[in-house]
Amino acid sequence: MTWGALALGVGLIVAFAMPSYRQGEASIAGTTAKDFKLELAGKPTHLSDLRGKVVVLNFWASWCPPCVEEAPSLNRLQRYIEPRNALVLGVAADEDAYAFSKFLVDQGVSFPTYRDPGAKDRGSPIALSYGTSVIPETYVVDRHGKIVRKIIGPQQWDSPDMRAYFDSLLAQN
């Protein structure tokens, strides 16, 4: 087999796989965000208790380099959206409580963050309930508790495009 034939074969696989991947991603839009119990500001609560707010639900871990990369822009996004009844909510897949706490301090995390106490072997039961197997992964949840967007991988959360997206979303009832 020549290199050209191999490249063509790989290209065809990618070309046919990508549309189904995108369709799968789109299919989550409009579904109700899975509820889970967490502790915020020392008080037990549920994700569903945050209805009425736009929630940027970010799954991350301290051992994840892309999560470290995007943490500063998530902090800036939190400052940008918080005055408009929205928040970034982090859920960490850290089994190690010390590593989790150190990450929060080292990165100056300013958004509410919860360590999934069931996290083991680099996995979070809460993240897995969403179908998340790669982190960072983020779900944007509207004021009605519906998922409106799923974003895989690190982002520049305070970029002009992201700000425009959140401006539009926050302008909706």
Q: Each PLM stretch: what is its role?
A:
Residues 102-109, 116-168:
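Thiol/disulfide oxidoreductase modules built on the thioredoxin-like
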Residues 1-37, 173:
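N-terminal targeting signals for export/organelle localization
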Residues 53-55, 60-63, 134:
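Short pre-active-site segment immediately N-terminal to redox-active cysteine/selenocysteine motifs
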Residues 36, 45, 59-60, 103, ...:
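Conserved hydrophobic/aromatic "anchor" residues
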Residues 35-55, 78-81:
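A short beta-strand-turn-helix
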Residues 68-108, 118-128, 164:
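Structural microenvironment flanking redox-active thiols in thiol-disulfide oxidoreductases
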